[in-house]
Regions:
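Cell-wall polysaccharide-cleaving catalytic domain and substrate-binding groove, primarily
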Residues: 1-203
Length: 203
């Protein structure tokens, strides 16, 4: 089964510029590096204030779901690895039912799409699979994922993401970064960054 910790180094590199040489270090150490690099408030980015890929709106959604106080931008900047990882798991990994996906590569490309483009991407994924596009990943969606040939499904998901990105207004500005991130994800669950194959550790 897919494992969430295998995906984390990919996120820390592309959201916060953690160097390739550091991506096989313990995850807590990678996150410490990411915290020093991961703050963004780009006026062209509709996400606004963002810490290691987590927008303030996303953090508010997470805190509301958990019953936590309404977060401030400073709390967003100060979030711990445990909180950041739980946001990834609660709002994206679990939304995709990724603990039930057999292929790490398929889990990676799906969850990364939800993270990058919003939870609504579950419906696009379901359309690719030919199941009811209700945005709820249940037993039928997971069965379709796991019954598909992983290489073929990965290719279809990859092509769908490229098509989606080309339709985004910000394609002109972010296309190179978006494609570099997508191209790093490999069907076997590894990542290739600057020509180097990365096999993530699990802790």
């Amino acid at each position: 089964m897919a494992e969430i910790n295998h995906l984390i180094p990919h996120f820390l590199h592309f959201e916060a510029g953690v160097p390739v040489d550091d991506l096989t270090r313990p995850l807590e150490e990678q996150f410490a590096t990411a915290r020093r690099r991961g703050w963004s408030d780009d006026p062209d980015d509709p996400g606004g204030k963002t810490m290691i890929g987590v927008t303030l709106d996303t953090y508010r959604t997470y805190c509301r779901r958990k019953g936590y106080p309404v977060p401030t931008p400073q709390r967003l900047r100060d979030m711990t690895f445990a909180t950041w990882r739980d946001i990834l798991k609660t709002l994206y990994w679990d939304r995709m039912g990724a603990d039930g996906i057999h292929s790490q590569g398929i889990a990676n490309i799906c969850v990364d799409w939800l993270w990058a483009s919003g939870p609504g991407m579950t419906k696009r994924i379901q359309r690719i699979l030919g199941v009811k596009a209700d945005g709820i990943v249940g037993p039928k969606t997971l069965a379709a994922i796991n019954a598909a040939d992983p290489t073929d499904l990965f290719t279809r998901l990859y092509n769908a993401r490229v098509s989606y990105y080309k339709g985004c207004k910000a394609w002109w500005k972010y296309s190179k970064g978006w494609m570099r991130r997508l191209d790093a994800i490999k069907p076997d669950g590894s990542f290739t960054i600057y020509g180097e194959r990365i096999v993530p550790r699990t802790q």
